[in-house]
A protein has these predicted regions:
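Penicillin-recognizing serine hydrolase domain
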Residues: 84, 88-236
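Active-site-adjacent loops and short helices of periplasmic peptidoglycan-processing enzymes
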Residues: 1-128, 137-138
Length: 236
């Protein structure tokens, strides 16, 4: 461990908690439910200069589309809409995120102020805590499916007749570079204060599971090599 318990700003790794809190309010039957994308969701993404999944105002997408839109393209509008869908208001959803933080026993060192990972002094965590959050998410079947997806195409809508295809650049890159075992879930992020960061779970050929959390990479591709180096050097 290096700086494992130091305060960090988790950027879009925050969305692992967003996914978990939303998923725990859902079941498999609700994944096909249709949700309309609101102008508030797209405005939130635009005004905060966030990455977006590409959903449009008035578009009717499934809950499953929404959840995948949170993680693979790191869509802020998807995270916002999921928060409203499951908690009613953004403020209540953030409260629910912090209740989950308490439940996981990490409230002394982790606190969330938004579901996207927008930089805020009150949106912070540690590498160890992010590992705890990813582990909890991977125990949830809905979350596990989303976090492990390499590619996903949304359902067809009037606005996107062919759907939208999302890809996990991190997982697809690591698959090409690393052939032993498998990285079974991941989320990347970026804010100036943490540079490029990522959290991932690896399952070795011996079926042992490991979680790696890194930050301060100068380039997005460097996070891939950071995680490969960790898994090669420390995992059996």
């Amino acid at each position: 461990k290096k700086n494992a318990n130091e305060k960090m700003y988790p950027a879009s790794m925050t969305k692992v908690m967003t996914l978990l809190v939303a998923a725990e309010k859902l079941n498999n039957e609700s994944l096909d439910q249709k949700i309309e994308i609101s102008i508030e969701a797209t405005d939130y993404s635009f005004k905060n200069e966030c990455s977006a999944a590409g959903f449009l105002v008035g578009e009717q997408v499934t809950v499953e589309d929404l959840l995948n839109g949170i993680i693979l393209p790191s869509g802020a509008e998807a995270a916002y809409q999921a928060a409203i869908m499951t908690s009613g208001t953004l403020e209540q959803f953030v409260d629910d995120m912090n209740k989950k933080v308490q439940e996981l026993g990490i409230s002394q060192t982790t606190h969330f102020s938004n579901p996207v990972g927008i930089f805020d002094e009150n949106n912070y965590s540690t590498a160890c805590d992010m590992a705890v959050i990813l582990h909890a998410a991977m125990e949830n079947e809905i979350c596990k499916k989303v976090l492990s997806a390499r590619n996903y195409t949304t359902s067809c809508t009037q606005q996107h007749p062919q759907g939208i295809t999302f890809s996990s650049k991190f997982l697809n890159r690591i698959d090409r570079k690393f052939g032993k075992g498998k990285v079974v879930g991941a989320k990347t992020g970026y804010v100036n204060q943490s540079r490029y960061c990522a959290v991932s779970m690896y399952e070795s050929e011996a079926n042992n599971k490991y979680i790696c959390v890194t930050g301060m990479a100068g380039k997005a591709w460097q996070t891939v090599y950071d995680h490969i180096a960790f898994y090669q050097n420390y995992c059996k």
